[in-house]
Amino acid sequence: MPYALLPPQANAQTPDLILAQEQHWLRDCARDSQPRAHLWQAPQCLIVTRKDTRLPRYEAACKQLAAEGWPVHVRDSGGTAVPHGAGILNLSLLLPRTTTDLGHYYHLLGAPLLTLLAEYGLEGNYDFVPGSFCDGQYNLVIGGRKITGTAQRWLAPGQDHNGAVLAQAMLLVAGDVDEGTRMASRFYELAGGELRFAPGTSTTLAQQIHWQGSEEALVDSVRGRLARLLTEGQMPSP
């Protein structure tokens, strides 16, 4: 299906503002049933879940990580803490709620990403990757290593709408993913949580295609390809 590609948010420089804007778009989608797509990036940070904010030393962890250059932000979708930065491209799909099948929306989310990977000569699949951050059965995986994490948030039906689904993916395009993995673990260590993640469980597109150019150039190329796939709707059906 073709998506309406939402414009970059010039004033939304922080993840908090970007994520808040997506909640407005989600309500718009619930009312008009038009699928939308949003490609975005965040500066270096960790984005955690509402559940994580209830950890016993959460506030102290946020203060320490901000001092180390990894400020903490909160999202409404599920999962665990995840790293963000210049080498990570995020895809958010805002979808009308047409079924209660979680897998349906994850496959809609995965379709353009799998097509993108194929354009780079890579074959991805869905699978768990034990030890990776935000692990789940709808990770996109290459050679047993995670290249995309996924999550969802549902807006329940209301009096004037049938509900909508926000499906989010973070594509690891470039950068030091092991450092990001270590910092996600450090959040839980500092906050008093039990989760820990293992370096070597994730990979990047740059690693997989042996990219020799700049990380920014690769991210720009990926963004352009994904924008084309999303707006033209030339992906296999989920």
Regions found by a protein language model. Give the residues of each.
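N-terminal lobe of the biotin/lipoate ligase/transferase fold
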Residues: 1-100
